[in-house]
Amino acid sequence: AKPMVELNTADSLTLLKVRGIGPYTAHTLIKWREKFGGFYAVNQLRDLPGIRAENADIIASQVTVDTSLVKKISINTASYEELVRHPYVSGELAGQIVRFRGYFRPFESVRELGQLDLRNPLDFDKLVPYLITHSTEDSTRSTR
């Protein structure tokens, strides 16, 4: 059996060895990996534009992700621009985060985002792996 390829560190040549990944898909994966700050789950492949679901499943069976490599964003210190750059953070959410901590207090937990008055419901499971409340917080600690 071929060794699993780790998605957060693989370069395009390594990605091309995975069945289901051609040059376009390798480029797409690296582009989105940079936008996200890393992948926390192989099923995120299904979210990526330009990768068909059946292809995502073929790829997913041959790759792993090292979640310790995911870049975290501190909701208490990140600027609006830093927040909104993340694909899962809408302009509305970024604005509310900055407003909340400006008017009230720093966030004590990422779960407090659920109390913000947002037009669109948050997809917590997608968002939580990328967010922390303190830049020094141990990123391995679960927020569930």
Language model region names:
Residues 1-2, 10, 24, 40, ...:
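Extracytoplasmic
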Residues 22-23, 52, 90, 120:
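Small-residue hinge/turn detector
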Residues 42, 109-115, 121:
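Compact, charge-rich alpha-helical regulatory domains located at protein termini
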Residues 49-71, 117-144:
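Alpha-helical interaction/regulatory segments in DNA maintenance proteins
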Residues 71-97:
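Short, solvent-exposed interaction modules
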Residues 1-20, 24, 30, 49:
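Membrane-embedded segments
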